[in-house]
Swiss-Prot record:
Ranges per topology, Cytoplasmic: 33-48, 98-101, 159-164, 218-224, 284-285, 363-395, 452-471
Source organism: Shigella sonnei (strain Ss046)
Keywords: Cell inner membrane, Cell membrane, Membrane, Transmembrane, Transmembrane helix, Transport
Family from the record: Belongs to the major facilitator superfamily. TCR/Tet family.
PANTHER family: BLR6921 PROTEIN (PTHR42718:SF46), MAJOR FACILITATOR SUPERFAMILY MULTIDRUG TRANSPORTER MFSC (PTHR42718)
SUPFAM superfamilies for the chain: MFS general substrate transporter
Transmembrane segments: 12-32, 49-69, 77-97, 102-124, 138-158, 165-185, 197-217, 225-245, 263-283, 286-306, 342-362, 396-416, 431-451
Protein location: Cell inner membrane
Cellular component annotations (GO), alphabetically ordered: plasma membrane
Record's protein name: Putative multidrug resistance protein MdtD
Amino acid sequence: MTELPDSTRWQLWIVAFGFFMQSLDTTIVNTALPSMAQSLGESPLHMHMVIVSYVLTVAVMLPASGWLADKVGVRNIFFTAIVLFTLGSLFCALSGTLNELLLARALQGVGGAMMVPVGRLTVMKIVPREQYMAAMTFVTLPGQVGPLLGPALGGLLVEYASWHWIFLINIPVGIIGAIATLLLMPNYTMQTRRFDLSGFLLLAVGMAVLTLALDGSKGTGLSPLAIAGLVAVGVVALVLYLLHARNNNRALFSLKLFRTRTFSLGLAGSFAGRIGSGMLPFMTPVFLQIGLGFSPFHAGLMMIPMVLGSMGMKRIVVQVVNRFGYRRVLVATTLGLSLITLLFMTTALLGWYYVLPFVLFLQGMVNSTRFSSMNTLTLKDLPDNLASSGNSLLSMIMQLSMSIGVTIAGLLLGLFGSQHVSVDSGTTQTVFMYTWLSMAFIIALPAFIFARVPNDTHQNVAISRRKRSAQ
């Protein structure tokens, strides 16, 4: 890093800025949801869509981000991403209704979808290969700090200012980042193949309408007939994509990926596993505030041990997998996370609040081990010519499953509770108890998938640079 010219180091700072903005926004909103609900006159049970609208948009737009950067140029797309993200933040702060907020969050999601993958692509183009790992470590460090600061900062702003400020703080950062991008970042382009627009649209429609249908009458107020229509449209769109991708060398995601057994198992496990894990960052601060009566700032502080546990475990995941193998690690961490979820609910409802930080720290450790193991299992056996496509599909599935997880969590709250819940009441705690029990069951289910991982899959084979950096 010290051998790089000053111009390159400034460009890396710009990318790191983008990583920080995107990672901060994914966690800062969770703590503010109850306050948003009160301000907008909505039930807290509807506020999961604030998360879903952002994450689902990211999932839909991710496949196009790398192609756009190659076609239009990394500077132009990175600048556009920052501008869209900043405008989305402004519109979020100005929103007077939930529907306005959801549209603004979707605009944020378009910017967020392009920011991180295009940032990775920028690092690949401006840094010599032998310094790539050091450069990526540098630019992703702010992305690790974002989740650490997000919950507490969100709680602090909500408690001592208003929820609008969790979006307003993005505006000066975004303006500085946009100007710096125009002045300092080169506009690399490269020859691209024709974009699979038909496949992209089919996948986008399928993912969006099925997630909307899953939210159902509880969240969107749709009639059973409308929900059935959405399900039919979503299924038809996905089936049409499969027919489109069969024997199509230009398909967005080649079906040849699924000939690799570890990829198929890893992708299925990642999808199911992140549905359960995706519920936790949303449900935990909501439960602490509405179920237990914590202040927004206190609830945000309680999330820090989980992030610290996750960051600390990343250093030894490789040794753990090499020692025990993928199947044992993934089955054990999946069942362990389910038990920890039950432990969190039990200690919280018993009033043992001093134990909660330790439980959340343990949850972060287990979750981090499982995430890292799922990612490497999915990609490690892919041939080089499919590595980039496989990584893109995995990234999309990660975002999609998180949006589905938050949607299911909102559904469970609506199923077990009324449309209006009071803070720290016996009835509310019962609603959360049943929701938490259901979550623990859902979290445990992927263990059946991971149990099918071959016994001899025990070595954590290093992922090539192309696989690590692909979109």
